[in-house]
């Protein structure tokens, strides 16, 4: 905790007062977690909600927390009723960064041989859409974790930063890559080289955040978006997510070819037929995820 306070004091910009988040219900599967809280939400329990829950450490991302996060993600990924996932933090911090105490005494050999931080990548492999609902600090690994999600909603007082430079290192979980793709080279370079934080408003203007919400309604608005996504065909949603993500990995020509392939693939699904039939018949589609 002391190390986190030192890091927070180094990140430039005024500190914000804490805000309160709503109470949470236990995970439906009965799993016992130490560092997260997970549950199903939405009118028909179609949304998986995961809350990072290390408030005394400002949700510092220790190995145990990441392991539990991966377990909850796997459970929701395998649940046929869940169509989208919301990832959020606490009242003061989404996540203030990686756990510095776990990293302090690591050597190059330790990092290389253990593929340090490799287990963070599981979030990027989830096929169901994941929405980050960010209140408070999203610093370092917390900012990287949010950027691994497909959509970012931010509370009005949220702040984003990559302050690793201030403790003698650089982002190691995709920060230099995803931040640059999201906000462009100039702002990303400034944030990475100075450790400066940006506000939710600046993050939205730069393209990092898609929506700013009142603090009190942030999570519920993210859940509403997730419910809307979950109401569509899950198999087609997965195809759409894959196609959009390909834009960051492929050339325009390659990405367009993949898009066409996935577009054609929807014509092999019952849901495509149902969706177009429902449109012609002027009724709501009844997707079966087939």
Swiss-Prot record:
Task: State what this protein does.
Answer: Converts unsaturated trans-2-enoyl-CoA species ((2E)-enoyl-CoA) to the corresponding (3S)-3hydroxyacyl-CoA species through addition of a water molecule to the double bond. Catalyzes the hydration of medium- and short-chained fatty enoyl-CoA thioesters from 4 carbons long (C4) up to C16. Has high substrate specificity for crotonyl-CoA ((2E)-butenoyl-CoA) and moderate specificity for acryloyl-CoA, 3-methylcrotonyl-CoA (3-methyl-(2E)-butenoyl-CoA) and methacrylyl-CoA ((2E)-2-methylpropenoyl-CoA). Can bind tiglyl-CoA (2-methylcrotonoyl-CoA), but hydrates only a small amount of this substrate.
Which Gene3D superfamilies does this chain map to? Answer: 2-enoyl-CoA Hydratase, Chain A, domain 1, Lyase 2-enoyl-coa Hydratase, Chain A, domain 2
On this chain, the residues bearing Phosphothreonine are: 46
Q: Which residues carry this modification: N6-succinyllysine?
A: 101, 115, 204
Related illness: Mitochondrial short-chain enoyl-CoA hydratase 1 deficiency: A severe, autosomal recessive inborn error affecting valine metabolism. Disease features include brain lesions in the basal ganglia, neurodegeneration, delayed psychomotor development, hypotonia, spasticity, and increased lactic acid in serum and cerebral serum fluid.
**Has keyword NAD?**
no
Gene that this polypeptide is encoded by: ECHS1
Q: Which domain of life is it from?
A: Eukaryota
Output the Gene Ontology terms for molecular function.
Answer: 3-hydroxypropionyl-CoA dehydratase activity; crotonyl-CoA hydratase activity; delta(3)-delta(2)-enoyl-CoA isomerase activity; enoyl-CoA hydratase activity
Q: What is its EC number?
A: 4.2.1.17, 5.3.3.8
Q: Which residues carry this modification: Phosphoserine?
A: 114
GO CC entries:
mitochondrial matrix; mitochondrion
Give the UniProt subcellular location, in the record's own words: Mitochondrion matrix
Q: Where is this site: Important for catalytic activity?
A: 164
Where is this protein's transit peptide?
1-27
User: Which residues are reported to carry the modification N6-acetyllysine?
Assistant: 101, 115, 118, 211
Residues binding substrate are 98-101, 141
Q: Which GO BP terms, alphabetically?
A: branched-chain amino acid catabolic process; fatty acid beta-oxidation
What Pfam families does the entry give?
A: ECH_1
| Species assigned in the record | Homo sapiens (Human)
The record's comment on protein family reads: Belongs to the enoyl-CoA hydratase/isomerase family.
Q: In which tissues is it expressed?
A: Liver, fibroblast, muscle. Barely detectable in spleen and kidney.
| Protein name, entry field | Enoyl-CoA hydratase, mitochondrial
InterPro entries registered for this protein in UniProt: ClpP/crotonase-like_dom_sf, Enoyl-CoA_hyd/isom_CS, Enoyl-CoA_hydra/iso, Enoyl-CoA_hydra_C
